[in-house]
From Swiss-Prot:
Organism: Paracidovorax citrulli (strain AAC00-1) (Acidovorax citrulli)
Protein name per its UniProtKB record: UPF0391 membrane protein Aave_3864
Subcellular location as annotated: Cell membrane
Recorded topology in the membrane: Multi-pass membrane protein
Domain of life: Bacteria
One cellular-component annotation, GO: plasma membrane
Amino acid sequence: MLHYAVVFLVIALIAALFGFGGIAAGAVGIAKILFFVFVIMAVVTFVLSLLKRG
């Protein structure tokens, strides 16, 4: 489960690069939305991973 949290975090960082860095001007809105979606997914899977261990 922790593996998924790391994967979602990496995807969020890549989306942030495109969205906030101005690399893909046409897809800025989508990249910003994807960034927040994947950050939330990373946090949720990280918390679930911690709850499963304890």
